[in-house]
Swiss-Prot record:
Compartments where found: Virion
Modified residues (N-acetylmethionine): M1
Keyword Ribonucleoprotein: yes
Name the UniProt record assigns to this protein: Capsid protein
One Pfam entry name: Cucumo_coat
Region (Disordered): 1-31
Organism: Cucumber mosaic virus (strain Trk7)
Length: 218
């Protein structure tokens, strides 16, 4: 007896028949996943080779030590002639300097280049005698004595330099917040005149946590 015409056989053959478009849909999904992976890889490569102008904060780039936080100040160097220097002492907010005995562990400088940046600058931070007037002669000597790290930051035709950070470790010096007024950020414009709207410096001072006022302002 031929069972091919039975109801059960008809249902089986119907179940085995593939749905229209199922193979093409799965193929499209696989292609989309592969394209997504390629785009993610390309974005990661571009992020390394062509950094954006908005660099991460201290907290975003490196975690603070346990029990520490950081205070940021912004410096905008003025116009600096070719071969000349700029120096500015660190000035933290009063809400921080009120706790002048809190320990400072590190100072980080982040260079944020503005669209007009096309120069080469040397940047450092170091302890400066209170008697120093931060003259060109005094700053020149400080760059050459090797007592603090120096970041050389320059324009590149393919994009701005990826390494935009200088980290100065003060742990062994037992520095505190009160000592920060003795430190200065120094900038040297090497190849040409640095215009006042070419770079912004973000200075992050990592220090022990300070109490937070819970009183509303009057």
């Amino acid at each position: 007896m031929d069972k091919s015409g039975s109801p059960n056989a008809s249902r089986t053959s119907r179940r085995r028949r593939p749905r229209r478009g199922s193979r093409s849909a799965s193929g499209a999904d696989a292609g989309l996943r592969a394209l997504t992976q390629q785009m993610l890889k390309l974005n990661k490569t571009l992020a390394i080779g062509r950094p954006t102008l908005n660099h991460p904060t201290f907290a975003g780039s490196e975690s603070c030590k346990p029990g520490y936080t950081f205070t940021s100040i912004t410096l905008k160097p003025p116009e600096i002639e070719k071969g000349s220097y700029f120096g500015r002492r660190l000035s933290l907010p009063d809400s921080v300097t009120d706790y002048d005995k809190k320990q400072v562990s590190r100072i980080q400088i982040r260079i944020n280049p503005l669209p007009k940046f096309d120069s080469t600058v040397w940047v450092t931070v170091r302890k400066v005698p209170s008697s120093s007037d931060l003259s060109v002669a005094a700053i020149t000597a400080m760059f050459g004595d090797g007592k603090s790290p120096v970041l050389v930051y320059q324009y590149a035709a393919s994009g701005v330099q990826a390494n935009n950070k200088l980290l100065y470790n003060l742990s062994e010096m037992r520095a505190d917040i009160g000592d920060m007024r003795k430190y200065a950020v120094l900038v040297y414009s090497k190849d040409d005149k640095l215009e006042k709207d070419e770079i912004v410096l973000h200075v992050d001072v990592e220090h022990q946590r300070i109490p937070i006022s819970r009183m509303l302002p009057t």
